[in-house]
């Protein structure tokens, strides 16, 4: 039986996958400090080259460059964020976690 997958079915399946990963994502967040979560969420919502720019920090309520640096140290060590060498942009490594964080109001 052939069936053409509709955009609605793709969207619904994607939502189900995100929901099925929710417990894992929440476990990841429980291991992090509030400052680390703030950095991770900022990167998910707005990947950037200019993580330490005053405007970016203000938009995402990031308090200090030192806090960002410490957060990045942990987040890169846990393989949660990376800086792409070619574009020099900070992003969340796991695309599902990225989407979940970007949509979530933390």
Task: Locate the predicted segments by residue.
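C-terminal leucine-rich, beta-strand-based interaction scaffolds used for sensing/assembly
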Residues: 19, 23-106
């Amino acid at each position: 039986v052939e069936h053409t997958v509709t955009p609605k079915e793709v969207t619904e399946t994607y939502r189900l996958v995100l929901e099925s990963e929710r417990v894992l994502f929440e476990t990841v967040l429980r291991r992090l400090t509030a400052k680390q979560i703030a950095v991770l969420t900022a990167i998910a919502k707005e990947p950037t080259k200019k993580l330490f720019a005053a405007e970016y920090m203000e938009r995402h309520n990031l308090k200090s460059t030192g806090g960002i640096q410490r957060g990045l140290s942990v987040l890169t060590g846990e393989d949660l964020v990376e800086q792409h060498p070619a574009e020099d942009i900070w992003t969340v490594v796991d695309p599902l976690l990225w989407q979940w964080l970007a949509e979530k109001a933390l």
